[in-house]
Amino acid sequence: MSRLYPERPWIGVLAAVRRGPRCLLARRGEGADAGNWGFIGGQLELGETVLDCAARELLEETAIVAEPRGVLTAFDRIERDAEGRVRFHFTLVTVLLDWQEGEGELCEPQHVTGLGWYTPEEAEAAGIPLSRRALELMRLALGHS
């Protein structure tokens, strides 16, 4: 299924990984968010739970192992073109994970071009371009027990 002008919503899963007072942010290499910093993520596969998807995408893209804790939140991202047609429609489920091991590698550089651990304040102060809702989701993840 094409992500542009799709027939139905595309289900994506974001991995909100926390390590102490920081969350892992990744600079996206492609797609609607290319160049922006946000959470690792990918497409939910048939027969896969959202928790397993978050852990799998994280491991595939960064070689980091983390324990899924549960669903943090879900939201839609819908964009229409000038004629009002749906250009893309993502339903994004954010999963909270606790870091276990791995320092992070750029295993799939076409998808992820940078990695860093940030508090929300550090991310703001760094002046890096952030994905929509990244700070809100970081604060939610870090405030969740």
What is each of the regions a protein language model found here?
Residues 1-14, 85:
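Acidic, metal-coordinating catalytic segment for phosphate/diphosphate chemistry
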Residues 10-14, 90-94, 112:
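Short hydrophobic/aromatic beta-strand or adjacent loop that forms the aromatic wall/cage
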Residues 15, 71, 95-97:
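A structural signal for short, well-ordered beta-strand segments
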Residues 17, 25, 97-99, 117:
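Conserved hydrophobic "DFG−1" position in protein kinase catalytic cores
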Residues 19-60, 64:
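Conserved Nudix-box catalytic region and its N-terminal flanking loop in Nudix hydrolases
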Residues 37, 102-145:
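Nudix hydrolase/Nudix homology domain
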Residues 65-74:
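A short coil-to-beta-strand element that immediately follows conserved catalytic motifs
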Residues 76-104:
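Active-site-adjacent beta-strand/loop module that shapes the phosphate/pyrophosphate-binding cleft
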